[in-house]
Amino acid sequence: MGKKHTWKRTTAAVMMLGLMTSAAGCSQSAAGKAEETVKQAIEAGKVESTEKDSVIVTMPVTSEPEAGFDPAYGWGAGEHTHEPLIQSTLTTTTTDLKIGKDLATDYSVSEDGLKWTITIRDDVEFTDGKPLTAEDVAFTYNHCRDNSTVSDFTMLKEAVAVNETTVEFHMNHPYSIWPYTMAVVGIVPKHAYDENYGQHPIGSGRYVLKQWDKGQQVIFEANPDYYEEMPEMKKVTVLFMEEDAALAAAMAGVVDVAHTAASYSEQQIDGYGLTAVQTVDNRGFNLPVGEVREKDGITYGNVFTADINVRRAINIGIDREEIIENVLNGYGTPAYSVCDKMPWYHEACEVEYDPGEAVRLLEEAGWREGKDGIRKKQGVRAGFTLMFSSGDSVRQALAEETANQLQEIGIEVKTEGVGWDVAYDRAQSEPLLWGWGAHTPMELYNIYHTAENGNGIGEARYSPYVNETADAYMDEALAASSLEEAYELWKKAQWDGSTGITQDGDIPWIWLCNIEHLYFVRDGLMIGEQKIHPHGHGWSLINNVDLWSWK
């Protein structure tokens, strides 16, 4: 290690106020909050990073797990999936999002896809010294099936411990991507699990929860009895704060990694560099398919976006690179699907920006330019309202940039911030800017497949759309005998040469960009090779924190 990061915390705290209030882009209120958060930690003797084997990281306040560190209630296997750190999982995902093994030494699935058999290691102990067995695995999954509030376990009928090292998963229906579920569900001890587990978790993973000061920080320490190679980082402190406060903390030199946003990307911080991590954290909007109809007080369909030529024109009439430059300061990649770069992604989703062809498609469909530059057809103006979640400045900027671009080809787009209490219903007839991106192909299913319980009209859940051929491919993918076979079927659901969800298919959704996750990282800290991050700017960063090192 060339230089040891042994700065004085108390001196940094004294310097912080001046640094924060002078920092461009940092509001005084945010600066004050950052100062108070870090000063409290310093005074309590909790924030220290003076050794080669410790690190301090900031995360958004929304990353703090409300229900604690319990896999049944969102830890690891929640909306924003990540490795649970405290607990072990049966499988894991590699940097290219293929499946590896953690507790599992072998796994297989029956020919009918209704039984998974997993063999686990026999040398793993929980941090209370008790052995981890198949009983614990079965208990964990059955408990998640019955109680999980954030993850779908409806495919699981029952988990059964056959012996101490063998567990069987009996399924309600074939589910070939079960290994991806096994990669995020942390195993909890049957003997030590109760309603308070999330506050005081016992696991067998790489780290132990040492301290949790709610609303402020969590501290992890390396598990001394971990069954694989000991973590390089023996202590990991996570501070929860907003982006402007995290920036201020980095400027004061009291954190090693600070999450940030594109709006702060031009900040120069002495002793830190800006790191951009590739993601599948995408933004896109739905285009309701089908004519307007109503059911149970909800309007479905849209007279303008029902036209397939309109949807195709919109897809190629948007300059994604310009959006990324204007809204994200260049920190993003064009998105063409909900699963770019994933093993199940079909490259047929990609399109070139072609406003000339977009205009031709609109003209061909009878949408003629009016005196005000907006197209019309049989008295209907070419346009729609593009909604975004209120308070999300990035989605608002994306919506406004999209509106500006589409106006160039004669489409009038109005933007509106809405709350999620009305957004879901309104999205059945109006486009809404969404954020998606997961380490599982099930997201394709959830967005495009006809909803099992219907969405009121027997079509896809989030926006009216039906493609029976694509549905069949996705059903076949879930019933496939191997992940490799399933990957090809997921690709066919996107485009099989004749139909699908791509530009030459039905194009019921438009994808704009994948937002790169940005961090100010202290010089000398090596954060290793990062997996492609899913939706959510939080725990994914420290999936591999055990491999981080100082030089």
Name each model feature, range by range.
Residues 57-59, 129, 250-251, 257-260, ...:
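Periplasmic binding protein-like
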Residues 58-109, 202:
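N-terminal lobe/hinge region of extracytoplasmic solute-binding protein
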Residues 74, 94-98, 174, 180-231, ...:
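Gly/Pro-rich hinge or "lid" segments in bacterial periplasmic/extracellular proteins
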Residues 133-140, 164-168, 205-206, 234-235, ...:
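Alpha-helical secondary-structure segments
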Residues 108, 112-115, 151-191, 524:
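Surface-exposed binding/hinge segments that line
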Residues 213, 217, 315-346, 350, ...:
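Detector for C-terminal structural segments
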Residues 368-438, 517:
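Ligand/substrate-recognition segments at binding pockets and active sites
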Residues 151, 158-160, 210-221, 237-296, ...:
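Extracellular/periplasmic solute-recognition and catalytic clefts
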